[in-house]
Amino acid sequence: MIRASLISLVAVAAIALTGVALGGSQSDLAAVRSATAPFHDLQAAMDAGYTFQLPDIFGDTCIANLDNPSAGAMGVHMVSLARVGNPSLDPTDPEALVYERRNDGSLKLVAVEYVVFDTGQARPSLFGVPFDWNDGSRYDLDPFYALHAWVWKPNPSEPAGIFNAWNPRVGCED
């Protein structure tokens, strides 16, 4: 009887702790959404120091997956150079905002991106997810680490989903 009670107690505690861990990550993402909600307004993003559209070396401001078009795109980036130069990572203060170009030419906020230049440091991570390394050549930049969080548009990609660099539901067609 005591053994069965202890097993039940351990099982309930494990479920409860798992719920806290999962809830914690959801609350972290909710905090990101709350902090970036004002940036649905492009003027608010510019007023906060985000520079409109980071083009790649081809002059494209909408970043598509050239190697695997079916993987989708990243979208149009607005970057804060002051935030990129800051070595600390704050989930509620991303280095870049990612927008999807709509059919009418307007932009809709779909994701945030965290960027850290590679200076030989350990690979950074947020939300328990390691950043992707990028050699920077497509953007005429030094090598950097990046992590996308699709907090405003669902990303069905596997295995990373919300943290995948590319979203098949985002395109760069004009």
Regions found by a protein language model. Give the residues of each.
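Sec/Tat signal peptide C-region and signal peptidase I cleavage site
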Residues: 20-22
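Positively charged n-region of N-terminal signal peptides that target proteins for export
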Residues: 1-4
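Bacterial N-terminal signal peptides
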Residues: 8-17
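Primary mode marks residue(s) on the alpha4-beta5-alpha5 output face of response regulator receiver
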Residues: 24-174
